[in-house]
């Protein structure tokens, strides 16, 4: 395959950074364009030190700026689109999430078609498939079962509609007369070093004398390590550029998991952090049905108060369902079509993540020492 170039959106994010680090090792790669709204100084420094023959260009721009996206897509062979806003607690306005996740994706598709970019890979999420009820069990689900989220909450809804737009665009005619090939990847809950969710959970526990909040003890999920998610995107980029493989991949979506044991969210948090003395809260907690109805009551109160006061409940029905469902998926289709095999084992992923948690614990201790002086 001849020399090629790749644009990665959300390149300063949790998954985006890992994709960039792997991408620069790809053969025949001439240029990587890393796009994000703003890059942290440490990310800029890290990217500038990458050992690669490929040119690494950092672009700071808005996914809602259609003209900027057109310029960013010029001369690009593959777009890997990871940029999105993730919000389960309804902190952000609904329209903001829809604009970034859906309109931003539509803008990027249009820019890619205008610039004749032949391959587009969308980083979707398992949340587009549900879970819709904590009472329903899905274990080792598969793509052909057609699970779909029915939630109107802005995050799963916007990601679902964006994924549909990407897959519907497959086969579109490019400006140069070529054909656009697209696919979408649906990772499970992603963990690993620098993960925002995990970071917040650990910091909250450190502020609570090392006690981890119990939020998802009824769940059975199969989390996936961030390095394996990034690897799946690399394989998708290879596949869409390979005429033989592309025929099976284009227009398809894939669940991305790995060999991390099926477990509850709480057990995962405990396993990754117990080396540093963190432990699960052993106090009594509400039964799941009661917790769900409490969430429903709080959402009703929030709705009734909306004309007068912006009350945001501490949790909602979607979050309770998401955190407490039996909801796992197989990666066999990705294995078959993309040649995907997890690059990082569970043991290695656990060790790397635990070591990173150790740095958070140390930083917290230093902060406490500074405050006590």
Curated annotation (Swiss-Prot):
Transmembrane segments: 288-308
InterPro entries given in the database record: 3Beta_OHSteriod_DH/Estase, Lipid_A_modif_metabolic_enz, NAD(P)-bd_dom_sf
Any matching Pfam family: 3Beta_HSD
UniProt KW Nucleotidyltransferase keyword: no
Compartment annotation: Endoplasmic reticulum membrane; Mitochondrion membrane
Gene3D superfamilies, per the entry: NAD(P)-binding Rossmann-like Domain (3.40.50.720)
GO molecular function: 3-beta-hydroxy-Delta5-steroid dehydrogenase (NAD+) activity; oxidoreductase activity, acting on the CH-OH group of donors, NAD or NADP as acceptor; steroid Delta-isomerase activity
Pathway linked to the protein: Lipid metabolism; steroid biosynthesis
Membrane topology type: Single-pass membrane protein
Active site as annotated: 155 (proton acceptor)
One Gene Ontology term, aspect cellular component: mitochondrial membrane
Keywords from the UniProt entry: Endoplasmic reticulum, Isomerase, Membrane, Mitochondrion, Multifunctional enzyme, NAD, Oxidoreductase, Steroidogenesis, Transmembrane, Transmembrane helix
GO biological process: C21-steroid hormone metabolic process; steroid biosynthetic process
Cleaved signal peptide residues: none
Ligand binding (NAD(+)): 159
Tissue expression notes: Adrenal glands, testes and ovaries.
Task performed by this protein: 3-beta-HSD is a bifunctional enzyme, that catalyzes the oxidative conversion of Delta(5)-ene-3-beta-hydroxy steroid, and the oxidative conversion of ketosteroids. The 3-beta-HSD enzymatic system plays a crucial role in the biosynthesis of all classes of hormonal steroids.
Recorded family membership: Belongs to the 3-beta-HSD family.
Name of this chain's protein: 3 beta-hydroxysteroid dehydrogenase/Delta 5-->4-isomerase type 2
Organism: Rattus norvegicus
Name of the gene this protein is made from: Hsd3b
